[in-house]
Amino acid sequence: MHKHQHCCKCPECYEVTRLAALRRLEPPGYGDWQVPDPYGPSGGNGASSGYGGYSSQTLPSQAGATPTPRTKAKLIPTGRDVGPVPPKPVPGKSTPKLNGSGPGWWPECTCTNRDWYEQASPAPLLVNPEALEPSLSVNGSDGMFKYEEIVLERGNSGLGFSIAGGIDNPHVPDDPGIFITKIIPGGAAAMDGRLGVNDCVLRVNEVDVSEVVHSRAVEALKEAGPVVRLVVRRRQPPPETIMEVNLLKGPKGLGFSIAGGIGNQHIPGDNSIYITKIIEGGAAQKDGRLQIGDRLLAVNNTNLQDVRHEEAVASLKNTSDMVYLKVAKPGSIHLNDMYAPPDYASTFTALADNHISHNSSLGYLGAVESKVTYPAPPQVPPTRYSPIPRHMLAEEDFTREPRKIILHKGSTGLGFNIVGGEDGEGIFVSFILAGGPADLSGELRRGDRILSVNGVNLRNATHEQAAAALKRAGQSVTIVAQYRPEEYSRFESKIHDLREQMMNSSMSSGSGSLRTSEKRSLYVRALFDYDRTRDSCLPSQGLSFSYGDILHVINASDDEWWQARLVTPHGESEQIGVIPSKKRVEKKERARLKTVKFHARTGMIESNRDFPGLSDDYYGAKNLKGVTSNTSDSESSSKGQEDAILSYEPVTRQEIHYARPVIILGPMKDRVNDDLISEFPHKFGSCVPHTTRPRRDNEVDGQDYHFVVSREQMEKDIQDNKFIEAGQFNDNLYGTSIQSVRAVAERGKHCILDVSGNAIKRLQQAQLYPIAIFIKPKSIEALMEMNRRQTYEQANKIFDKAMKLEQEFGEYFTAIVQGDSLEEIYNKIKQIIEDQSGHYIWVPSPEKL
């Protein structure tokens, strides 16, 4: 039982302190307390100075224990410290006034017994805890909290995090706080690096969101402006325990799996090497001291801190039978703590592991650790807590009851994918798009079973019925979902089985990742985006790339996986990674998609097998476009043809002695073309078109137009493919000839061409390889923002036209450009042209993949 410490020995003060600690009351109104303003000198009462007024929910206590009152707190003047929460005033009692002067504050009692003041209990942690003495405990065994102020600058995609919780829908039992549920990769929060999942947001700028409804917190974040100041509360992780372990290798090697390292972080922002799996029957399990979540510091005399994944693998492989390990074990957290994660080891196991084995014939599978988790038999007794930081878990303690979720469609649809619908097995959420409506709401989860959409019962629906219901749902969609991870695991296990089969076949050669016999090397251009972090089946460290990137495939002998490195304008990258083979890309997509139809509204793909708008894997939307013939009507040209999956295009390096023509396609192309010629008249020019129209008096032949003597001659030249594009206006023919383009190119100028996508291939056939750049609008709203005179209908038409353009000619683009302003787009285009203006270029190769 805790001892109730108080500021003096008088009975009145003791009673106030005791009751403040024991009673759980509603939070006081602003102004009840005078608290130092965490953002500067106090200019008024508590309503505008600081974030006082939190109930005991802010610092939850262990069930059944009597919390220690917070009667003294020492404030170290750091300029941005947020003071601890004062005790709740007790009705009917004289309330101690908080003294805000001097370096600290304390309950000011009415007696003269100040001699006991220095014995009062310490305060909880404050902002900038590095300025304080360590190990300041909160409520005894309840753990420790840290308060931090974080200033974020709103980026192109917002603040880059998702929230959940509030008085109306608590994220944590008995806590109405607003919690961070996801940090979106590449967003403002991720780039800043300080905000973390499970942080509790207490204040947004000057708005107190500690106890508000969810919508109020969302509103505060939306209205916060370009620079947002957050005050957050988080658990202080218990200090690590350093342990030395000697392991004797057994038949299964060391018996554990690892993940992490520089360039392959297991936890964002952390280069450490983590133990992710204890193999049943292995040396580590028999020894009993290593656990999932332990951090490897050293192997024998080799330091494993801040090393690459491959270096850690090599250090573990190159050991004798007796191995010395130095590990850091996370501190223990009490089992009854409502904020703590469930027992990870008794509930989950990770998939794409790195099995350490001393058997040289088996090699080493240095896989990227998968973030996907699957149920597995318990590895430790359920009463034993596995001290994994909460952000390392794929599943939290989450309600299994049906939940009502309201989503509003955005430019990416609803932002999630579904699987299932066969033999009445149910419809499940399989993927949440980062930054999409589902992700930003924080309410829908992977593994949720969709029970209904806008009142339409989907409990026994087929996949097609569910996809149709979601497609017809309108802008505001009400979903009833139920978290069923056990049922969803059957779909995950299919991926797992596929990966295991692939790895077993790969091991037969002893290479550890790919079959190395008959190595085949080639260069390819990527026709889709690939994100290695979303591929749970990788047999080794993957290599991410974007559409248009040149890849040197150094080993294409394996049917499923290739080894490759990126080729940049400055040479080849040293990093080698695994990418999916052409066969794997095409097989995976054809198996998943019965038909592929371009979704012009969202710029994504639509299928009768998956929810429209998203891809359920690591492939970008670009690889799903159907290849069509050179015609402006992409839909009619693709009818009756089997859609081809765009994966890789074989290329070869070629030396050229001309300035490549430039074709800009998409919105704002005319403005970009004009600006290029105006700003760089010595680098860019235009060619002289041909026409059968009679010459006017003020026109010069060869300068204004090439005036063709007869229509028959021009028609013949068009039939002989001497023109890249031609058309008719007022019974006169107009066109751009290959020779006109070549004349500009051979003078050392980039010929700016205002033509359609059909001209790209015709120029390639004429050995004039253009720099073809597509300006891809981010959304209809983005178009309207860049041209405020446009109506929604006009912007919508432009957006649809751009999406159809990408569908039809995407495989011929040199690069795709996006931006939030014309200036940003223009600068990117200039850089691309500069990068592509060398004497050596990559051109399509006749080689077959």
From Swiss-Prot:
Q: Which domain of life is it from?
A: Eukaryota
Looking at the record, the residues that make up the PDZ domain are: 149-235, 244-330, 404-484
What are the boundaries of the region Disordered?
Answer: 32-101
List each coiled-coil range.
none
In terms of Gene3D superfamilies, this protein maps to: 2.30.42.10, Guanylate Kinase phosphate binding domain, P-loop containing nucleotide triphosphate hydrolases, SH3 Domains
Domain named SH3: residues: 519-589
List residues of the Guanylate kinase-like domain. Answer: 659-834
Q: Note the InterPro entries from the entry.
A: DLG1-4_PDZ_assoc, DLG1-like, DLG1_PEST_dom, DLG3_SH3, GK/Ca_channel_bsu, Guanylate_kin-like_dom, Guanylate_kinase_CS, P-loop_NTPase
Q: Which UniProt keywords apply?
A: Phosphoprotein, Repeat, SH3 domain
Which residues does the record list as Phosphotyrosine (modified residue)? Answer: Y705
- SMART domains for the chain: GuKc, MAGUK_N_PEST, PDZ, SH3
List, alphabetically, the GO terms of the cellular component aspect: AMPA glutamate receptor complex; bicellular tight junction; cell-cell junction; cytoplasm; glutamatergic synapse; neuromuscular junction; neuron projection; plasma membrane
Gly residues biased stretches:
41-53
One Pfam annotation reads: SH3_1
Q: Which positions carry Phosphoserine?
A: S157
Q: Name one GO molecular function term.
A: phosphatase binding
- Could you confirm whether the keyword Phosphoprotein appears in this record? yes
From the UniProt record, give one GO term of the biological process aspect: regulation of postsynaptic membrane neurotransmitter receptor levels
Task: List where Polar residues composition bias occurs.
Answer: 57-69
**Protein family (similarity comment):** Belongs to the MAGUK family.
The role this protein plays is: Required for learning most likely through its role in synaptic plasticity following NMDA receptor signaling.
Quaternary state and interactors = Interacts through its PDZ domains with NETO1, GRIN2B, SYNGAP1 and APC. Interacts through its first two PDZ domains with ERBB4. Interacts through its third PDZ domain with NLGN1, and probably with NLGN2 and NLGN3. Interacts through its guanylate kinase-like domain with DLGAP1, DLGAP2, DLGAP3 and DLGAP4. Interacts with FRMPD4 (via C-terminus). Interacts with LRFN1, LRFN2 and LRFN4. Interacts with FLTP. Interacts with GPR85. Interacts with DGKI (via PDZ-binding motif).
The protein's name: Disks large homolog 3
Q: Which organism is it from?
A: Mus musculus (Mouse)
Q: Which gene encodes it?
A: Dlg3
